[in-house]
Amino acid sequence: QRALFSLENPTTLPKEGLPVKALNDALLSDVLFIEIRPGWQSDVPLHIVSIGCGDHVGFSSKIFVSAGENCHVDIVESHAGEYGSTYFSSCVSNIDIKAGARLGHYKLQNDTDTSTHLALTQTSIESDAVYDNFVMSVGGILSRNEVRSFIAASGVECCVNGAYLGTSNQ
């Protein structure tokens, strides 16, 4: 069975049933590629910051992560907005975790109270690898964080957690 995607051929993602991805593809404005070498380990997380600003604008980003065999790294994503601004944010993350790798992926979605945030995280996880995901959503009039994982072999640990803190008219 084929993984959801590959960095070598990112077009292998299915189009059906992925409306956030389809919208992201249509509006794509920024792409980030992160390749973590096999065996590389870090106690310091990689921090990706996305700041929305301006009124009635939209931006769309895509993140590709390839975690090499037996590497160990944490990635933190922070999404925030300029106070008072109203915008639309779409983010798709494609993460490929090779055999024996450990990847922590933690996201704080704290956009403005009048903004919309749609996100999709897709992972492909190989044998004896670990993927730990946590999403905290505290901002936005509307927010969606979808996580899909393809477990490609045995011995995989995949942990997906999240929390929403709704206030006012969210």
Segment roles from a protein language model:
Residues A3-Q170:
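Conserved beta-strand/loop scaffold segments within soluble protein domains that form the structured core
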